[in-house]
Every structure is written in structure tokens, then in C-alpha cells.
Amino acid sequence: MSLKEDVLKLKKEKNAIILAHYYVDGAVQDVADFVGDSYALAKKAKNTDADIIVFAGVKFMGESAKMLNPDKKVLMPDLNADCPMAHMASKAVIKKMKEEYEDLAVVCYINSTAELKTMADICVTSSNALKIVRSLPNKNIFFIPDGNLGAYVKKQVPEKNIILNDGYCITHKRVTLKDVEKAREEHPNVPIIVHPECVNEVVEATDFAGSTSELIQYTVDNPSKEFVIGTELGVLHEMQLKSPNKTFYPLTDKLICMNMKKVSLEKVYDCLLNETNEVFVDEEVKAMAEKSLDRMLELAK
């Protein structure tokens, strides 16, 4: 049997579900029960009746799955697959902001540690951030940890006073305005679409910005036969599956998340076979952090 067949057989035997993010290797996406962005994966983790969740993604995703469904065994193919941005906010700064602004809502991007989520009023993902921020009664919003997604939300929701944090995605930050200009020259009249984790000047210079699921849907719905893609290149796997007759060009070959790429099919098999790399979240942290996740799922409906 092939490794893929071994994984599928094992998954059935153990009543396990494999959840994979669009940024992991295509071979891993192919064995997953569900492939999605952070929001869709969080919903699936919350509602699954499987005994074991194998989360093919980075650490904060496994933590979120455990908090949303604490009775399940959550395994990760590689516990060292971490997201640097998830740590890029300071509890001290959050406390200071809360003291400074009376009606402050701390809005925490789901790409954050469980510890940071304990300080948040609500979590958001890139696909529901606009909807949720608009719906909050608070005028003042401290958006953590990603300053670039925060800037994108701030521009779209001018009626709120959105205070930005200085965190960033190390992968999306590599994209420059020069990359966009070069793509315009090489592929004239081809839509350039990017993730709002890119810096603001890049987002402004392109044709569409959205979450990974929104970018995929854009390439399905748009009549163009070609697209320039400005997000982690793992997403091309799903785009090509959904639109096999369309052509996709990477905005830059620098758009590779080394942490997502640590998740291999071999590691998926090993962690499921031996039930290793289980995710645990401190009970006190879980009790505080899960409120912000549950509130997100409620408000994003």
C-alpha cells in the first residue's frame, strides 16, 4: 500500500478526522477530510464527532481545536510548526490599552497563542474580521497581533478607532511593491490577488484582497483564465483542483511558510499511528481563551 492509502486506512480504523490548512503540502491536503482556512477549520474542529483530530497546520490551530473541543484527542504532525506572528503581542501593552480606553475591545486574530487569546474580548479570522469588528458596540478596537490585517480592517471600517499592533506574518511581509510592479509588467491585465496579511501598500496596489478561502472563491468566480497569487503558495493546490483550466502565477517565490511546510504526509502517518504529539492547553488558559473563540463563532454566523 502507498503511504496515502496507509493514512486513509488508519484514519478509518481510529475514527480520526484530518483537518488541513490550505498552506500545507498538497499531499497532506489530499488525505484530509477537510481543507480550509482558519475560520472554517475552527468550525469543523468544534463540530466533529471523530474521536481524534489530526490538525495539519501550525501550533495555534491545534490549540484552538483543543479549546473548542476539549474532550477530543488533538494531535499535530509536528509540534515545532509554530507561527512567529502568533507571539507578536505583549500582555503588558494590552493591559495598558485597556487602562487608556474605557470602551476598548481587544480583537485578537486567531493566528495567536492561547495565552494571548486569554486577553481578548473576541477572536477573528481574516474571513470574518470585517463583519465582527463592524458588529461590536465598542468604538475603540485594539487589533492584535497582526498590524497588516489590522490596517486592512481599519481602512474598511473607518467608523471605528482601530489601534494597530506591530505584529506581522513573516511570509506575507516578504511581498513588496516591486513584486507587484514586476507582475504587472510580466502579466498585463491579469488580476493580482493577495492576502491582507501583506503590507498595506501591496494590498492597495492589487486587484483584490481576501482570506485564503475568499481568494480561492475569487479565482473560481472571476472569468479571467489567469491570476497572480499573493499568498502562501500551498493555496495553489486547491486553486488548481477547483479551476483546472486556469493558470496561476505566484506573485513571488518567497511566499513559502517554512512552518507550514514542516507538516509532511510521513509525519501525519506517524502521529496518527502512534498517537503522538498530543496538544494540551492549560485548564485556566483554556477557560479564559475559549470564550473569545466561542464568541467569534457566535458573531460570525
Segments predicted by a language model, with ranges:
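Active-site loop-to-helix "anion-binding N-cap" substructures in soluble metabolic enzymes
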Residues: 1-229, 235-301
